[in-house]
């Protein structure tokens, strides 16, 4: 059974047509490689699948459900996107660990942040360290 289906997906940025009538299926457990020249739309397809951008037309299904109708928090437990260029969400370690709380408009749980540091063998003072000082 296909875990992912794209049906006639198109994407347009301004006046530029990036993708047109893209359709394919990925079976559960399968690997998929997207190959093409720079600007061919590979990253755009991945951003569409991750629901970071919306298709101009067409549908994307995950486990037989239209991804536009799945709660984004639930969808992101199964599907994510790793950017080609790493992105950080502030200057301090605490800024980056707090980001998920901010996205969900929740109060930052400092106790949980300290627990996360402990799980990776880092001391509490790392919360205030500049991210560029870490390797």
Model-derived features with residue positions:
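Helix-to-loop junction immediately C-terminal to a conserved catalytic motif
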Residues: 50
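Conserved ABC ATPase signature
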Residues: 130-135
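The feature captures the beta-strand-to-loop junction immediately N-terminal to the Walker
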Residues: 35-37
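Short beta-strand immediately N-terminal to the Walker A/P-loop
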Residues: 32-33, 81
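Conserved ABC transporter NBD signature motif
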Residues: 58-66, 75
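Conserved ABC ATPase "signature" region
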Residues: 108-126
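Conserved catalytic motifs of ABC-family nucleotide-binding domains
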Residues: 86-95, 104-105
């Amino acid at each position: 059974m296909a875990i992912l289906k794209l049906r006639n997906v198109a994407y347009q940025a301004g006046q530029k047509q990036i993708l047109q009538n893209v359709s394919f299926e990925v079976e559960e457990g399968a690997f998929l490689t997207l190959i093409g020249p720079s600007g061919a739309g590979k990253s755009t397809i991945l951003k569409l699948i991750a629901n970071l951008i919306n298709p101009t037309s067409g549908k994307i299904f995950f486990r037989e459900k239209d991804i536009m109708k799945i709660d984004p928090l639930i969808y992101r437990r199964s599907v994510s996107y790793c950017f080609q260029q790493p992105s950080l969400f502030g200057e301090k370690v605490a800024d980056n660990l707090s980001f998920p709380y901010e996205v969900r408009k929740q109060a930052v749980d400092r106790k949980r942040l300290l627990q996360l540091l402990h799980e990776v063998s880092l001391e509490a003072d790392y919360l205030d360290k500049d991210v560029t000082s870490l390797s």
